[in-house]
Amino acid sequence: MKKLLCAFFAGVLTCSLTACSEDEDPNAPTYTETSDVEVALYKLLPESSGKAASCRSRKVGEHYYLACNYISMGTAPSSLYVFYYDKVKDPVKRFYALNGKAMSLYDGQLKYEPILGNYKDSFGLPLPESINMGEVMKVFEFMRK
């Protein structure tokens, strides 16, 4: 129950700081879409882990990305799971696992989440020049502190 309340209040705080702003970009991930991913990650945690899933979206260049990790009091945050956001490719899927950690998690435990996909399977490789993983990871570095 504590984890659920923490996730709820983190979501409310996120909404008040980002998604509920007046100058919202219509191409950006919505609060609901981001929350759906956060809940999917939260469901993977053991009952008494004391951890919560945390996701943040950012625009890097011409694309939006979502980075998620697990957080808990007194421990360093987990590695980042990075997803590419696209609402045109598929009528349901919105976030596509982009980095190795996200692809492994998707293939192993999140394959049946309707909002999620795998970038490699959906768009193919190599990544286009407009996606610079170094820049993307740098933008989300704040989540690792």
Regions found by a protein language model. Name each.
Residues S21-D23:
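Bacterial signal peptide processing site
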Residues T30-G50:
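N-proximal, solvent-exposed amphipathic alpha-helical segments enriched in charged/polar residues
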Residues C6-T14:
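Hydrophobic helical h-region of N-terminal Sec-dependent signal peptides
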Residues M1-L4:
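Positively charged n-region of N-terminal signal peptides that target proteins for export
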Residues M103-K145:
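C-terminal partner/receptor-binding element of secreted or periplasmic proteins
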Residues L44-S104:
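Mature extracytoplasmic domains of secretory-pathway proteins
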Residues C15-A19:
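C-terminal motif of bacterial Sec signal peptides marking the signal peptidase cleavage site
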